[in-house]
Amino acid sequence: MKINSKDDIIDYFKDGFKEKLFIGVENEKFLIDNSSGKRINYKQTLDVLNFLKTFGWTEVKEKENLIGLSHNGKSITLEPGNQIELAGGLCKNIHEVCLESYNFQDQLNEACEKYNFKTISIGHDPSTKTNDVPSNPKERYKIMTSEMPKNGSLSLNMMYQT
């Protein structure tokens, strides 16, 4: 494209506009067992995921292992230390983002109440040592656990505690 005038510059940017823009948000929660004060293990995470299926979520499996859920363009995934992450759908505005987040939190709260767990929304788990974080059977996390330390001494901390 040749730019010969101010209008050419304006047209260049106008041509890049998209008609429909969306917002997509991810949020992650640590789940804590109220009885022990520790992060929940994979078996306990399965209880939560199976409970969430009552809200219309469908299973996502890797081999025979339940590793997440999906529903209407949204997904719930298990992170390396059994953190639960909602990858939201395409939202038109911040109000839809809030509604989606609140609905998910309400569902998660119901599951946690049933199993005596609580959610914590913080960026880093300050009370669990990396070696004590429970794991799950996702294949890529096994590979990442062995490979990531080659690139930094805190890589497993980032993976399991954030």
Set out the residue ranges of the language-model regions.
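Terminal catalytic/cofactor-binding subdomain
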Residues: 1-152, 161
